[in-house]
């Protein structure tokens, strides 16, 4: 993919919809001097990534879709830098500007250096689901209202950060998308008890998870449910890893390997599920 708007060392792309079909690849061109590529989806549909998503160069790739992101069983990543996927509605920058997916008519970005964080302030954040093999050379970050990964997450030389957060949260980042900390609302922010994950996967027939008659997501064969604010992880390989759930953190037949720190954080329960 070519084009976009260059501002300093950043390249900005906007899409009405963004999907990668099974067996196909979508690669962002990486002009000289570009260190980070920021892409936002301004339409009303989730992104379905069923093929390979990558960068033709060393730039970090950020994908923002407030409607949800689904990585299918054949999905893979091919960036030489870091990857961040989020259902936040906006990226925040050091000069006070935002790259918003829900308010794309804001004044154009002029001079932007590095992102400071992602912001969730448009109701219950949508879900991210991964059933594929997501691997990066540097950092791999998935940030949503619910994050369920029954596939592979791999960043042997970097950080893997997976976080499920409530509306009103701001997540602070490094210049490469590494999660630094989470500023969650202390109180007063209503939560939607419906399942954004169910909406994302209900017609997909994907392994490990199913949507029951009450439109809630369950682990196949267990009866345990996944609600908004949960994180589900199966295979994680990284230098360091931080898995943060607003509600429950569930490790499904998990194989988690790190050479450095491993942080498992849950507002409610950490569950280990085997079949």
Regions found by a protein language model. Give the residues of each.
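Extracellular and secretory-pathway beta-repeat/beta-biased strand scaffolds
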Residues: 1-275
């Amino acid at each position: 993919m070519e084009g976009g708007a260059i501002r300093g060392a950043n390249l900005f792309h906007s899409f009405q919809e963004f999907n990668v079909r099974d067996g196909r690849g979508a690669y962002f061109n990486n002009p000289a001097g570009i260190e980070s590529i920021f892409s936002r989806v301004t339409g009303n549909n989730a992104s379905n990534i069923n093929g390979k998503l990558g960068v033709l160069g060393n730039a970090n790739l950020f994908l923002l879709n407030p409607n949800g992101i689904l990585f299918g069983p054949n999905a893979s990543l091919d960036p030489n830098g870091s990857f961040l996927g989020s259902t936040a509605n906006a990226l925040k920058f050091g000069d006070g500007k935002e790259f918003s997916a829900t308010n794309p008519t804001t004044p154009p970005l002029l001079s932007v250096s590095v992102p400071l964080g992602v912001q969730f302030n448009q109701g219950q954040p949508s879900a991210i689901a991964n059933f594929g093999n997501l691997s990066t050379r540097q950092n791999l970050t998935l940030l949503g209202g619910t994050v369920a990964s029954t596939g592979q997450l791999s960043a042997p030389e970097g950080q893997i950060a997976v976080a499920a957060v409530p509306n009103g949260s701001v997540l602070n980042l490094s210049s490469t998308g590494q999660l630094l900390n989470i500023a969650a609302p202390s109180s007063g922010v209503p939560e939607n008890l419906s399942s954004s994950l169910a909406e994302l996967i209900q017609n997909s027939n994907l392994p490990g998870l199913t949507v029951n008659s009450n439109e809630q997501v369950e682990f196949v064969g267990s009866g345990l449910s996944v609600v908004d604010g949960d994180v589900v992880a199966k295979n994680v390989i990284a230098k360091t890893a931080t898995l943060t759930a607003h509600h429950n953190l569930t490790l499904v037949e998990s194989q988690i390997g790190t050479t450095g720190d491993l942080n498992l954080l849950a507002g409610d329960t950490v569950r280990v599920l085997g079949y």
